[in-house]
Amino acid sequence: MNKFLKYFLILLALVLIVVPIVFATLLFKTSQDAFESSQDSKNANRQSNLRDNKVNPEEQPISILFLGIDDNDGRRKKGQDAEHSRSDAMILTTFNQSKHQIRMLSIPRDTISYIPKVGYYDKITHAHAYGGPIAAMDSVEATMNVPVDYYVRVNMKAFVEAVNELGGIYYDVPYDLNEPNTDDTGKIKIKKGYQKLNGDEALAVARTRHHDSDLKRGQRQMELIKILFQKAQEVDSIDKLDNVIQIVGKNAKHNLTNSEIKALAKMYLTNDVEIKTAQLKGKDDMLNGIYYYHPSVESIQKYANLLRKDLELSPINDKNDFLDQRVINHYGSLIPLTPLDNSLLRKEQNDTTDKDKTSNENSDSTNNSDSSNQQQPATDQNSNQNQGGTQQAPQASNNQNGVVN
């Protein structure tokens, strides 16, 4: 795969919310091998539960779920690895070549969502911890009723190293911070005000959610990423882009094939592309003393139909076609951590991770846990203080699959 194609995927992976097409002119200055080791080949042929056939990016609109995780040495020492970490950022993105359009929908990490891997509602951030990228894809499909064709996952460590490689960034910190450092081995203290931040400090600003909300956190992440790309556009940063590419490449994973990336690059880097962004609308909710973000069915339907239109699929006019509405009709509300009545589920709202495991007998056993060993919820030590509740987090039945937020 040539560097033109690799750079296209790297831009998508690192940004998570904005695709800077202007960087296409720099493609031929980038690394030759940044993404070979990051390809998830065993899931390259995954077909969405909501598709009759696997999509062809060269001929059809597609969707990609972008996942940002925080995998560091401190958390690994506590038994958490990349496959069992929570997702800190989740962006469902559609690519429509005929409209020259990319649409990105941000899904807040605390969104209450059905997770097929475990068979009950929980925070959507936990889906990745329960079963990796495929479990996260299944959860998004179950909630949104929109096909999720591919995923790109990036470790937040890439953000830290990229900021440092580019010499830091300037940002107006909204309040005094005292946050865990990148490896969760100490604290980072930052004063309020406009200042230059190194990678660890920038990540601390991006991660904090004790002073405001999950939505504000997402907005800060967008601002910091945009600033980082503006920094990369500076003339004196161009000679550092090769190193940035290597940084992102070693901290990413995806299930796109070389030919699929080639098709995407051909269509979206050689044409003017309109970028649209949105975020699920909803309300803060306390369920059993735990904070959740509860998107309205109206918002889910609205954005699902926009995304489905991008994918050239028919709209969903009946709210009862959304699982959340059927559950509310049946129980009166969404009930977390409680197995659902099977009559509420449709065949596409099933776990595909065990199916993938069966077809890949030699795969790493940590990627797909047997249903008899599914994780149980445990107290989340990083509670959302402004909501006054204690969060729940997935935890394995053994230390191998334990999770730390």
Curated annotation (Swiss-Prot):
Q: Please provide the record's keywords in A-Z order.
A: Signal
Taxonomically, which superkingdom?
Answer: Bacteria
Biased composition (Basic and acidic residues) is annotated at 348-359
Q: Compositional bias (Low complexity) spans?
A: 360-373, 381-392
Signal peptide (UniProt feature, chain positions): 1-34
Q: Where is this region: Disordered?
A: 348-405
Q: Could you tell me where the Polar residues compositional bias lies? A: 393-405
UniProt cross-references to NCBIfam families, sorted A to Z: lytR_cpsA_psr
Which PANTHER family does this UniProt record tie to the protein? Answer: POLYISOPRENYL-TEICHOIC ACID--PEPTIDOGLYCAN TEICHOIC ACID TRANSFERASE TAGT, POLYISOPRENYL-TEICHOIC ACID--PEPTIDOGLYCAN TEICHOIC ACID TRANSFERASE TAGU
Would you identify the family this protein belongs to, as annotated? Belongs to the LytR/CpsA/Psr (LCP) family.
Give the protein name, as stated in the record.
Answer: Uncharacterized protein SAOUHSC_00997
Q: Which organism is it from?
A: Staphylococcus aureus (strain NCTC 8325 / PS 47)
